[in-house]
Swiss-Prot record:
This is ATP synthase subunit beta. ATP binds at G152, G153, A154, G155, V156, G157, K158, T159. Its EC number is 7.1.2.2. One of its GO terms (molecular function) is ATP binding. The gene is atpD. Pfam families: ATP-synt_ab (PF00006), ATP-synt_ab_N (PF02874), ATP-synt_VA_C (PF22919). Produces ATP from ADP in the presence of a proton gradient across the membrane. The catalytic sites are hosted primarily by the beta subunits. It comes from Campylobacter jejuni subsp. jejuni serotype O:2 (strain ATCC 700819 / NCTC 11168).
Amino acid sequence: MQGFISQVLGPVVDVDFNDYLPQINEAIVVNFESEGKKHKLVLEVAAHLGDNRVRTIAMDMTDGLVRGLKAEALGAPISVPVGEKVLGRIFNVTGDLIDEGEEISFDKKWAIHRDPPAFEDQSTKSEIFETGIKVVDLLAPYAKGGKVGLFGGAGVGKTVIIMELIHNVAFKHSGYSVFAGVGERTREGNDLYNEMKESNVLDKVALCYGQMNEPPGARNRIALTGLTMAEYFRDEMGLDVLMFIDNIFRFSQSGSEMSALLGRIPSAVGYQPTLASEMGKFQERITSTKKGSITSVQAVYVPADDLTDPAPATVFAHLDATTVLNRAIAEKGIYPAVDPLDSTSRMLDPNIIGEEHYKVARGVQSVLQKYKDLQDIIAILGMDELSEEDKLVVERARKIEKFLSQPFFVAEVFTGSPGKYISLEDTIAGFKGILEGKYDHLPENAFYMVGNIDEAIAKADKLKG
């Protein structure tokens, strides 16, 4: 099924066929030479222009393409490698290895455009996905097969939390993770790869990168490449997979560029008219089935901190939980710097998590909120002017704040403290004890950077001794 290139407009390429019309999303391959080098360019059909002419989006730079070059339609969408062989390697949007490691052949490949699981195959049970991170499990628990938004500025610890989650899934749930770098900096991708290598989690994760410098087609479709690899682990191997998308905003942004290049009339703020349906199509594939689940953590960049911007607003509609990182908390030296009052989860419901967990979580939030309200009085008049009751609230709040910190496995190199995975039962028991006043006699420093409450008691004895 050969055609030829009739027009090249940046990343948009028109291809003519004589007696064949490729379907939308079908892949077309162009092999050509430019500056003495051989190139293989993959195009994806985006529109039919009539008379067997199709308009395609290029998955790589179109430098060196000329009219009249032969193009071959593959009769199927872009297909990428799947299975255990993909672990520990880096792929681009078309499923080629880009980590300069040894070349291996993949026996299994899946198309990146797939339907979401049928309704009867989906699991409707609401289950908590235990992460081993106290602040997350207690106050904004993740749903198995749910979607989590990770909000935070530069340098507050998004990547460290992502790596800790990958570590805990690998070692505690013996599960796999997939990381899709969607339109982010190449340097960050490189750093992540090296850090994963150092913290021994690389062999449990597959990495797919479509970086900032690539054409919009590659940046948009890389999310589907990563998702397809995760779907294989869920559907064929029956695993609970963790899928990271950094950054989901770039998925919408590249979609808007593609839409403009294809000549579609833009909608609000210049975004593509199909923004909601594209996002819905993608997010619907991330779900739990009766065989396994894909739990996704999506970093969300909010342009100009405007939460009403159509791109982040469309993402919000799909999220089950939000983990908000706060610079003020990081400045206090409390890591992970998760904001206990701003982070939310639909799982925080007594019918799902049980009465005890719900009461402890709400109790913790209420004490922290009271402490926040008293900050101004403390700043102006000092602690001595508070009533005895308020003094107690402040003391407990400071202990809770410190106890929400914990040493991470992936940060052992920097902190020198061994990482801790805290079970949900231990987390609830610890905070319940603080709220009930069982540990009012312990110094607040005993609660800083420890795992469960027993470690805090042991640390207090050490501090006394």
